[in-house]
């Protein structure tokens, strides 16, 4: 083994060792067990075994000597046998605890521990002794201390054995003789059991007593001794409240019984009991010791022991080291005895001398380590006494022995030094700073706050004053602003803003809040949060008074307020411990403890000032982040300095316990700047006060009962004790506390108040600030119920208005008076003008005069009972200042009396008689004696203390050779782990190579040391930005990482430059520089800051200068000059976003228009963009690609980037682009315009459409358009949040421009038209024809201008009004028609937009979003998709043009306060949109109409994200899909977006005749407004034009219906019918101009007749379409087609080709014409019909050709009409028209063929047909065709539609169409590519090939002529 480095440190003088040894005590029980353990553990260690063997022999021989006690008779001292087999042969533990055994065993244990330690350190006992500075022993431990002191180094182990033998002999005889001399116990068994049951243990001769001080214990002992009992002795003083009593067991039991009646239970709450009156928490415990050591009871022992030891001698000069013990009542070093024998002294020190253990321990006060060799917990006793001296106890006995022996062999620092409180926490002198003439005092508090060590506490009302607080701060002291005196948000905010403007920029504010007022605290914390986080007020800390919140609440405040320190005012030991729990939970946050104890002014505890700190000091100092401040009772230098240097505790027998600062409170109330009324100041100065130096047993505590020193303690409104001056008012308060407010029973209180009513009222009126309210005109007290309205008014004014100063005490009192007048008005009023006048009066004279004028004698009416209650409620009203009077004696009397009782001390003028004796004046009983002068300036008060302290400090430093100045920096090693260093002259480089690095704080501390500017730049959390505080961006940016390089450059030995070079280790050369942060300290107080990054091959830089601010002490703080800094940032971003070669936009205004470059979209650029965006997302999505020329919608932002960012750089915005947050971005294609394609050339224009200023900054919205050939293609809208408000010196212009949604008004009544025309803002372009029945479309935009407070100031609304196409009432309005007028309105001071309000009430948006009734599509399996955020942002930055370095450079992102680089919001947006594009399968990028992402949180590279999709609405035929993106790890939403998607290509098909049925469409009619509107309009048209109820026909299907022509309207209807039949009288057979009616008949019901089936079907289908449109599901550009009749329905529903009513008339005409085209029998039936045929049901290979052949054969065989007229579904569905006989044959032939084995054979078909020809001859038009296997008759169809039979009627129908179809109504864009006509089956077109196709099918001669002209013009 190598020598111990620890002992090397001892030899070098770095450590000083002492030894201590234990004695009798609880360890007596286990002494032998430990001996056995050590004997076995060191069985192979010869020196240890030799000691055990020799000791065992000695003890065995001594026990064999005959003795008068006969103790060892029959049992002896067989130690060796016990060591070999203790279980079998050793005595019982209770016997071993007896002194004859325990005394030598304990001595041997200590010797053995010492020997083992020496052996382990490779020393002999003498060599170990040579390392010691001295030794002490607790009781018998002094024998071992003396033994090791005589162990010579020259003789090694033998010398030690001889010394051990001496110690054992002494121990044996003292133990035996003491046991024999002890008084015998006379306790009976029950008395012993009593002690055991009370937890006191088995009675013995020593009793441990803890919890009492020495004075109490001595009084108790004297009392018991005086009662004539056996003698009791205080034998050992183990600590400040730890004692041992010696005596006979029955005498000691008497002590136990006496203490049982006076001691307190540990669970008893005595926090409200003044500490001198508290019952002590006492613990008593008998010790297992069989003799009353250290008492006169053993006075006979010394002679007997000396006789027994015979010729043994020990001289003082035999001791090689000091050994301390008690001798003759004092502490002695036994070496001082010289040649005299000290054995008798040693014996007496154990038997009769009292042990003063603290005195023994203080003999080792220069120790660094005390080696405790036991037995028992003697080391703990040393630790208790010497804690705080820098000493550390090393326990080398018991269970900790082995581990501590190992530590002794490790290193010199393995055993840490204890804290030397006096040196570590005492004030230090800091040498004079530059610009200062004097040195200053430094403590933990001064280092934190940068102010002197004396501060001013938060006090209500004194430090509620911004002026006083500002004066203290300007005097360069720390003070707390008291929030407790503010009752609403507005006044607190105003005061704090005023204060922040009044203090130096480098100083900050600490706010004091009251935890016991939870309601006020809640809103005050919210106010502070807003002022700190949103306005940047320099509020750095809070102090919490009147309670300790939970750690969870504190965490919430820390996170919410971003405070730099938090202070608490604990009132007890338990509260201190709760603060320490908080401090341990937040070890990096400075936590202040302001200890004031019970002597504080104002609210106070009942604690002594000193005792709790003595108890808690060690625990407090174990939390390095705790700052300890002493308050209460202070006011000068002499009384405070002992608490600063810690000497106060030395007087009490403790180590020095310095505080970090001094807190002054009520002392400041007499300061000149305090608002305390002068009369109050005089009373304070006159109060004598009391002293409290810790030795007067708390004289101030008597304030609880009566005035002491002019101060008394009363119970405040919060129910807490409060110290106040003993004015008449406060003596009354105290009296009422005792007499009335202490009564808890409401009935008893009521009775007491009633009994003493007169006395109470008189005392209030004579002595208190709040007089009795109700009094008569002759000033006689009465009750409110007896007052008149006039008397109430007069008394209110008298008590709330300060007449001689012509002011209301508080503005809320004027409101109270006005509210009472309103109450009176409600009772007495008549609504006269005079009544209204008094509500505008503001003085009592005016108010009373107006009241008299209004009511005269009525005012003398006594208050109505209801009004009494209302008046009391007004007095109680929350939010107003509590009333300054007592209105009644009721259950709330204490509240009336005490509420809001502190303000009067600052406004005696508002008190009755201006009598200061009537008010509550906060003062402390001790502190008040220091206030001797009124109106002393705060600076003089505070400087007087600190300057005197400085003189005292300089004097102490001059006499202390070991004193260290604060400026002296401890030398540190030059190396930090993980960092390589190189030096080149004055340049030092640090290469951060890893693999691990020290913390940033450690690196910064190593770099800057005592460099003030470096500390300000790299360590200060805040900087001054403009006039407010902001996080220090340099500190945030300076976070060195592995691979980085730091350069430090020095000049004249001073740090001048610091540069951090950032490199990316994963990208090649570790020295490759990606960015840099450079700091240069310029001459004077300037610091230059440079940030470099790399972008597009350039190195754009941010360069600016900062100013150093600060006083002559404490840390400096940097100030960023806002204008210069923002100019620098704008230059950087101009370079990044726009380019140096382009003109800067900073000089133009907020209303300017900005343009981007002219850009041609190339496939290469788009593909590069897609490649970058496609790198993130699920694997399948990354592998997926799109095609086609359409440009992705996200790329529009890339094109528009320059135009979108130019406005941000406006100087007028006063914005910091580094603090820019992208809130949202909306991109949408202009409807109806071809989207962007590759190859398009576009330009961009933009402008600011919103600029609003909030408490946290600005919200700026920029709108832009991409224009192709001058026309908008894409519209963009992006919103930025710019943190930090603009300065008041720049433009505060706020506005919002809104493109309102197109609004539609249906002018469906004359009333609505008149209302519209009455609006002044509705301006027609010229005379307009009747607008009734028309639809107006409003396309408007609004501009709102806001005032400085953000409230709307003016509104401008303008835009155009257009007439919708005539048919748009049927379907949703999808197009805009002709302009007919405009809207223009300007208005100031408005609440809402009146134009939009009108349009919303009378109209609706043109495009309405329709929520889905149930959750829609969620992407199926892709409803929740996980993916990884982009791994890097450089690629996106390059392709997008957004080269903002916060996305790519850690230095810049940290500088901006964002931490690590943030993924571009638009990069994430493009990634998410592409994933959605993949999910919907939009391969050609055509389905996105708009994309609007909003960004909710920051996303870092490689974050795991989850994407959720929900289709939740439809809008104008498009799907509206909501997308959420969340972080997988936390569930935090980081983005949400809305996509408007075209549906997959949809075709709308309308059915034809044959599908009608009774009641069709009526279910929808009953449930859907849009469908009902269509039916109702059709109904109105048919009734008005044709006298028919279409709804009746549909609902009832009548077989006949008569239209009467008798009336005038009936004749008009007849004329309409006649005009329809002019060209074809067969249409309405029998109708003439003389017809008085006309009846329609049809046997199957009119709904089955063609004439009514066709319009009914058309209306039903258009209604269905309108329903779909109202749900927003109709695709606006969808393809549509109609089957036969359905073609009319499709054109009516999907186009504006014809007005709805005209279309219905056309279809009715068509139906009538077809209905009567063919002859009918008497029952109205024709010979024709139609069937649907499905050839596949005959056989699967029966094809279309076979069906056509079959139809031809049937027609041929029957000789009548049969044709295939509709080709619906290939090989599946066809419709055949023909004669009923041929249809019958076809149906039966199909049935036969389906059973045939060869149905395709022509022969088989002919045979089947032939088989049915004979039977068909009996088929007539009355025969009902039945359904066959392959055929279905079309019910109600008896016309062979689409057959050759009807061709002869085409010309007539063509003429009708030409007459009714207007070319002007036809819009080709509604038809081309969308309509699929029946005749072609191909989408409609207007090109020549399509015309040729139509002409070929129809043989149209006009089309043939058109084609000829086209050919000629080519």
Curated annotation (Swiss-Prot):
Region (Enoyl reductase (ER) domain): 446-692
Ranges for domain MaoC-like: 1398-1532
SMART domains linked to this entry: PKS_AT
GO molecular function: (3R)-hydroxyacyl-[acyl-carrier-protein] dehydratase activity; [acyl-carrier-protein] S-acetyltransferase activity; [acyl-carrier-protein] S-malonyltransferase activity; enoyl-[acyl-carrier-protein] reductase (NADH) activity; fatty acid synthase activity; hydrolase activity
Gene Ontology biological-process entries: long-chain fatty acid biosynthetic process; sterigmatocystin biosynthetic process
NADP keyword on record: yes
Key words, A-Z: Hydrolase, Lyase, Multifunctional enzyme, NAD, NADP, Oxidoreductase, Phosphoprotein, Transferase
Span list, region Dehydratase (DH) domain: 1009-1509
Pathway: Mycotoxin biosynthesis; sterigmatocystin biosynthesis
Factors inducing expression: The genes forming the sterigmatocystin biosynthesis cluster are co-regulated and induced on oatmeal porridge or the fungal isolates were grown either on oatmeal porridge or in YEC medium (0.2% yeast extract, 5.0% corn steep liquor). Expression is positively regulated by the cluster-specific transcription factor aflR that binds the palindromic sequence 5'-TCG(N5)CGA-3'found in the promoter.
Catalytic reactions of this protein: acetyl-CoA + n malonyl-CoA + 2n NADPH + 4n H(+) = a long-chain-acyl-CoA + n CoA + n CO2 + 2n NADP(+); holo-[ACP] + acetyl-CoA = acetyl-[ACP] + CoA; holo-[ACP] + malonyl-CoA = malonyl-[ACP] + CoA; a (3R)-hydroxyacyl-[ACP] = a (2E)-enoyl-[ACP] + H2O
A GO term from the CC aspect: fatty acid synthase complex
Record-listed E.C. numbers: 2.3.1.86, 4.2.1.59, 1.3.1.9, 2.3.1.38
Annotated spans, Acetyltransferase (AT) domain: 17-395
Highest rank taxon of the organism: Eukaryota
Chain positions covered by the region annotation Malonyl/palmitoyl transferase (MT/PT) domain: 1548-1900
Family the entry assigns: Belongs to the fungal fatty acid synthetase subunit beta family.
Classification via PANTHER family: FATTY ACID SYNTHASE SUBUNIT BETA, MALONYL COA-ACYL CARRIER PROTEIN TRANSACYLASE
Protein role: Fatty acid synthase beta subunit; part of the gene cluster that mediates the biosynthesis of sterigmatocystin (ST), a polyketide-derived furanocoumarin which is part of the most toxic and carcinogenic compounds among the known mycotoxins. The first step in the biosynthesis of sterigmatocystin is the production of hexanoate by the fatty acid synthase (FAS) units stcJ and stcK. The polyketide backbone is assembled by the non-reducing polyketide synthase stcA by condensation of the starter hexanoyl-CoA and 7 malonyl-CoA extender units followed by cyclization and release of norsolorinic acid.
Subunit relationships: [Alpha(6)beta(6)] hexamers of two multifunctional subunits (alpha and beta).
Designated name of the protein: Fatty acid synthase beta subunit stcK
